[in-house]
């Protein structure tokens, strides 16, 4: 089995993110439904990057619980408390979690045994309310770079601003 293609350099990654963000912006222009937005973002990201093997959102449904939202890939964990796993850590701390090797992360929850690396970015409103976390898993060890993290954080900020008034949790 061949490994998924990982863009070789920072410029290629940044360009790919810029292109997908342009598509996402066009698709979400005027959109007010948070669930539809999450589904669209997950789909666009997942089909743009070959090294993304699970791409989706866990919605913040209370002050201490995430529930799986729209995603692409195999099944996800259904519920994740804030005190468990990489997604829980991102929700709890409101900070991006960058995990080059999930085998080295003591708190990693193995929703899929094939996952080797992960990045999780909180999606918060400008006033700090957590809407969701964006979770990206790869079956490739050390698949993500600082460029991935920075670009996903930019996307999360934009989503948090656009959907700050959503009633859907």
Question: Which residue stretches match the model-derived regions?
Answer:
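Regulatory sensory and allosteric helical modules in signal-transduction proteins
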Residues: 60-113
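Intrinsically disordered, low-complexity terminal regulatory regions
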Residues: 1-75, 154, 158-169
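A short acidic/small-residue loop/turn micro-motif
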Residues: 74, 138-139
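Short hydrophobic/aromatic beta-strand element in the GNAT-like acyltransferase core
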Residues: 54, 120, 133
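Sensory-domain boundary capping and coupling elements
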Residues: 124-138
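A short acidic/glycine-rich loop-to-helix N-cap element
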Residues: 141-148
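A short, aliphatic-rich beta-strand micro-motif
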Residues: 117-125
């Amino acid at each position: 089995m061949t490994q998924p293609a990982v863009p070789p350099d920072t410029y290629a990654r940044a360009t790919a993110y810029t292109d997908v963000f342009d598509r996402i912006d066009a698709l979400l222009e005027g959109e007010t439904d948070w669930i539809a937005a999450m589904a669209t973002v997950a789909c666009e990201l997942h089909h743009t990057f070959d090294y993304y093997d699970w791409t989706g959102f866990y919605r913040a449904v209370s002050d201490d619980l995430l529930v799986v939202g729209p995603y692409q890939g195999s099944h996800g964990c259904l519920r994740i408390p804030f005190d468990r796993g990489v997604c829980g850590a991102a929700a709890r701390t409101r900070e991006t979690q960058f995990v080059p090797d999930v085998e080295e992360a003591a708190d990693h929850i193995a929703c899929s045994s094939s996952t080797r690396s992960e990045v999780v970015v909180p999606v918060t409103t400008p006033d700090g309310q957590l809407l969701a976390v964006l979770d990206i898993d790869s079956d490739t060890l050390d698949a993500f770079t600082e460029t991935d993290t920075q670009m996903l954080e930019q996307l999360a900020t934009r989503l948090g601003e656009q959907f700050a008034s959503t009633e859907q949790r």
